[in-house]
Amino acid sequence: MNVNHNDNRPMTEEEEDRLPVLLPVLADIDGAGKTLFIGNAVAANDAALLLNNGITSTMNLAVNIEMPPLALGDGSVVRRTHIGLIDGPGNIAHHLLGAVLVLHGIINQQSPGKAHYPPHRAGNVLVHCRGGRSRSAGTIALYLHLARPERFPDFEDVLLHVRSCRGLDETQPQPAMLDLCRQALAIWNRSAENGQVLLR
């Protein structure tokens, strides 16, 4: 949790949401050196910050926020993906599972380049929503548990890892998001071959 240096108290969410938040969650997420980051919408729109951290793809999970195109200082363009989840009740587990599968695609997508595509290069990946506390944290935790079970065999343990990386307490992700994660996990575990074929 960030601290307000004027009076040494924890920042409110509103105060934190005015500042860029960008934190690594797992290095070498793809076996080829990419790092997965968690952050907020302010960070996702900060070209210098993204360039300095090697981030070339962002995934926006906020249903109510549209991110504009963004060029980096090296001439490449950030590849944007948007899967809009509601911040609280109202989502279904299949939508969250869709976000997990799309994140897997973003992480492993190649960037061969075409003449009619904006210039892009492979790089690190940022998952964000408005504040990067609930939707992003829950989606990343579920993704790591499903895609990297050898590293994160237990969902509750990976949740602690993501909370630690982001500086969250037990109130985040929100209860509705945690319930959604557990519903999605139950659906995944009922599917053929426990769904593992989808993330290989």
Predicted regions and their residues:
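Cysteine-based protein phosphatase catalytic domain of the PTP/DSP
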Residues: R18-N124, H145-L180
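N-terminal glycine-/charge-rich "phosphate-binding" loop or analogous flexible N-terminal tail
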Residues: M1-V21
